[in-house]
Amino acid sequence: MPIDYQRDDQRRLITVTLTDPFTLEELLRQIDRQWAEHTWEYAVLYDTRAVSSATPPVELQQLVEHTLVVGAGQPRGPIGVAIPPRPEVLRRGLQLAELAGPRREIEILLNEAQVNAWLTRHAPRRA
């Protein structure tokens, strides 16, 4: 399955794991799902470490625009994007954060330690 969507209500966390091949439309459906499930303020970790190529800039723009339309200006939870440590993917990750603008909290995560630190800050395990 190219996109795996896991929801953890206790941690207020959604984990979206992408693998090849997936389409932009499939990814946009995950955003629609989050809105429909009333989990817009949950932390979302997009794990793209198993994806072989960087998302084209035009698709990044469509992703950001779709998110803004679906969210209708409502505050969104923090977004973490785990990427493979490759220069072209890092460039696209930074481009995504820039396109999203200052109203969106997007962190690009390069390694497991950064992913774990992000999860600790934004989706701690509760007793």
Locate the predicted segments by residue.
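Amphipathic, Lys/Arg-enriched alpha-helical "gate/interface" segment within cytosolic domains
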Residues: M1-A127
